[in-house]
Design a protein with these regions (language model features):
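Composition- and surface-driven signal marking solvent-exposed, interaction-prone regions
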Residues: 229, 276-280, 323, 346
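Active-site-adjacent beta-strand anchor residues
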Residues: 20, 266, 320
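Hydrophobic membrane-spanning alpha-helices of multi-pass integral membrane proteins
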Residues: 261-269, 324
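Terminal amphipathic helices with adjacent charged low-complexity linkers/tails
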Residues: 2, 6-9, 167
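Active-site phosphate/pyrophosphate-binding segments
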Residues: 11, 15-52, 144-262, 272, ...
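Internal helix-turn-beta structural module
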Residues: 308-310, 314-336, 340-342
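Residues at the start of alpha-helices and the adjacent loop-to-helix junctions
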Residues: 112, 156, 221-222, 275, ...
Length: 361
C-alpha cells in the first residue's frame, strides 16, 4: 500500500525532532524478526567475487560506512566498493553472476536506485535491498529485503539513516562471524540515549546560527558523517555548508575558511585523528571556532575547540551511528534559529516548490 504523508507541522516539535529522539528505540528493534534474512543474505554475499553498495543522498552516505564495515568486519577486503546509484547505473560495467549488489533506499522510489537494482538483477548475481517499511514496489525484485523503519514524515531523513547503518553493520558482522561487533552493536542504543540528553542543543545552535558557512570535517567512516551533516544542514536549515574528508580539506579548501565560519571536527580515535587535529589548528589560526566531536577523554583537539561534544568510546567503524546524531540535533535547532521548517526542504515555498517539481528524482 502506498505511503501517504501526514499533515505538515508548522512549529516545534517538527517531525524531524520526533524522528531524532526515536532513534535509540528504533535501533534496539531494527534487526528483530529479520535474523533468517540476515543469515541467508550474508551467506550469498560472502560467496560473491565482489560486492557493490549503491544509494543516493543520505542512503549513499550509509553505503560509504557500509563499504568499510563490509571490508573489515565482513572480511570482504578489496572485494567491496560503494557507488552513488547514478554512477553505478551509468558508469559501472554490467554486473555478472559473481557480483552481489546491496541497494539502500529508504523510500524505494528514486529513479536511479531502482535502475541500479534492475541492473544488478539483470547481471544474475544476488541483490539485497535495505529500505523502509511501506517503501515503493519497485524494490520487490530483490532477492533479500531488510527493513528499517516506517517512512519518515520529514524530508530531512535521520532515523532511516542510522537504522540503515545498523543493518549494514549487522549484515557485516553476520558475514564475518564477528561476535564482538554484534555485542558492541547491542550497546549502541544506550550510548545514543545518553548522548541525546547530554547537551543544550538549542544553546549550541543559537551560538552559531548566523555563521557565514558551516564546515563538517571527518575521516575514515566519519567522512560519511561529515557529508551527511552537510546534507542535513542544506535540507533542513538551508545554510551554506561544506562536508569533506579531513585530508581533502587540507589540500586547498582550507583557503576559503574565514573567521565568521564554524568548523565541526568529527574525530574519534583512529587513523584520521592527527589530520583532524591539523584541521582544528588551521581553523584556530584563521579565527574560525571549532566544535569538536571527540571522545570524552580527548586532550588535543578538545583544547583547541570552542565547544566539545563527548562521544562514547566505541569501535571507530561503528562511531558514525553516534557521531551523526548530535549533528542532526544541531541542524534541527539551527533551522529553528533561522526560521526554517526542517521538514519540507522548502517545497512549501513557491520558487523552491517549482524547482522540486522539475527535478524528476
Amino acid at each position: 500500500m502506498a505511503w501517504t504523508p501526514p499533515p505538515p507541522r508548522t512549529g516545534h516539535p517538527y517531525y524531524m525532532h520526533d524522528a531524532i529522539y526515536a532513534q535509540p528505540g528504533a535501533l534496539r528493534l531494527v534487526t528483530r524478526g529479520q535474523e533468517a534474512t540476515f543469515a541467508a543474505a550474508a551467506e550469498r554475499l560472502q560467496a560473491m567475487e565482489r560486492v557493490l553498495l549503491s544509494g543516493i543522498g543520505t542512503s549513499w552516505h550509509a553505503t560509504l560506512v557500509g563499504e568499510l564495515l563490509f571490508a573489515h568486519v565482513g572480511r570482504l577486503g578489496h572485494r567491496v566498493r560503494a557507488f552513488h546509484s547514478f554512477e553505478f547505473k551509468n558508469s559501472w560495467p554490467e554486473p555478472d553472476p559473481r557480483t552481489g549488489v546491496v541497494v539502500v533506499s529508504h523510500r524505494g522510489t528514486k529513479r536511479f536506485s531502482l535502475e541500479a537494482l534492475a541492473k544488478a538483477k539483470a547481471g544474475g548475481g544476488v541483490a539485497v535491498v535495505i529500505t523502509g517499511k511501506g517503501s515503493g514496489e519497485g524494490l520487490a525484485i530483490a532477492d533479500y529485503t531488510l527493513r528499517t523503519v516506517d517512512q519518515e514524515a520529514s524530508a530531512a531523513h535521520t532515523i532511516s539513516y542510522t537504522c540503515a547503518m545498523m543493518l549494514l553493520a549487522a549484515l557485516a558482522a553476520e558475514m564475518g562471524g564477528a561476535d564482538d561487533v554484534r555485542h558492541e552493536l547491542e550497546g549502541i542504543p544506550d550510548h545514543l540515549a545518553l548522548l541525546l540528553g547530554q547537551e543544550a542543543w538549542d544553546d549550541l545552535a543559537a551560538r552559531f546560527a548566523t555563521r557565514r558557512c558551516y564546515y563538517f570535517i571527518g575521516g575514515g567512516p566519519n567522512t560519511a558523517t561529515a557529508l551527511e551533516a552537510a546534507l542535513k544542514m542544506n535540507e533542513a536549515s538551508y545554510a551554506k555548508t561544506v562536508g569533506m574528508n579531513c585530508e581533502q580539506f587540507l589540500h586547498g579548501p582550507w583557503a576559503a575558511l574565514e573567521a565568521d565560519d564554524v568548523v565541526f571536527v568529527i574525530a574519534p580515535p583512529g587513523p584520521s585523528y592527527e589530520r583532524c587535529l591539523a584541521v582544528a589548528r588551521a581553523a584556530r589560526e584563521v579565527g574560525a571556532p571549532v566544535v569538536a566531536l571527540v571522545r570524552e577523554d580527548d586532550k588535543e583537539i578538545a583544547a583547541l575547540a570552542a565547544e566539545t561534544i563527548a562521544i562514547p568510546p566505541v569501535n571507530e567503524l561503528l562511531s558514525p551511528l553516534l557521531t551523526v546524531v548530535p549533528l542532526q540535533l544541531f541542524t534541527y535547532h539551527t533551522a529553528l534559529q533561522r526560521g526554517a521548517n526542517p521538514d519540507t526542504m522548502r517545497a512549501d515555498q513557491p520558487a523552491h516548490g517549482r524547482a522540486r517539481a522539475s527535478l524528476a528524482l
